[in-house]
């Protein structure tokens, strides 16, 4: 018997069922359909940030002004991006950067690269305050090839793309242990189950 589980995917569905049962005063003895697996069988990928309608950012000036370590890279050389690094792609080039070490004063969400990039660079450089509701930002799943993202930029379909590192299971676990919430579109979970259409009647 397991005392508790971490929900890797489908939080909104679990929350919706929980809210319904609480408001209706009913108890579902059968629970809800779920798949339980070991964390070693779970693959966590990132979601990348696509920025449009802001104009091409001068990332080098921003990095220099804010003492952010970065380097220019060529996609043809298949650059390696470490787990504590991110990449920003513009029509002028591709840059790998690091925001440096986190501090013990930060909570688990504040330590995430996605949080630091959204609250720092995307807000400070692009002027996007709310990444959940701003039409200028969209998201692309983490297994998208870098060349495809660069092609989107070269076609003029967006201003830049922030290529984010995937969060580790330990990071996701730490967020849950602190009773916090992962930022929207910060994890792409695999495997995706091919279950077809499944319905469960609660009423």
Model regions and ranges:
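Surface-exposed, charge/polar-rich loops and edge strands
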Residues: 1-203
């Amino acid at each position: 018997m397991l005392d508790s589980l971490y929900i890797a995917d489908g939080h909104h569905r679990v929350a919706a069922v929980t809210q319904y049962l609480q408001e209706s005063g009913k108890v579902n003895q059968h629970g809800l359909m779920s798949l339980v697996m070991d964390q070693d069988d779970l693959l966590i990928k990132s979601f990348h940030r696509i920025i449009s309608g802001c104009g091409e950012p001068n990332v080098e000036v921003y990095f220099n002004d804010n003492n952010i370590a970065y380097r220019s890279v060529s996609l043809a050389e298949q650059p390696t991006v470490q787990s504590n690094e991110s990449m920003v792609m513009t029509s002028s080039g591709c840059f790998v950067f690091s925001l440096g070490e986190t501090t013990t004063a930060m909570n688990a969400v504040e330590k995430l690269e996605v949080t630091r990039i959204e609250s720092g660079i995307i807000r400070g450089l692009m002027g996007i305050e709310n990444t959940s509701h701003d039409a200028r930002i969209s998201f692309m799943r983490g297994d998208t090839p870098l060349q495809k993202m660069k092609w989107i930029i070269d076609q003029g379909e967006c201003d830049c793309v922030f290529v984010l590192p995937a969060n580790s299971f330990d990071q996701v676990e730490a967020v849950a242990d602190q009773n916090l919430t992962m930022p929207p579109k910060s994890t792409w979970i695999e495997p995706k189950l091919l279950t077809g259409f499944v319905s469960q009647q609660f009423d």
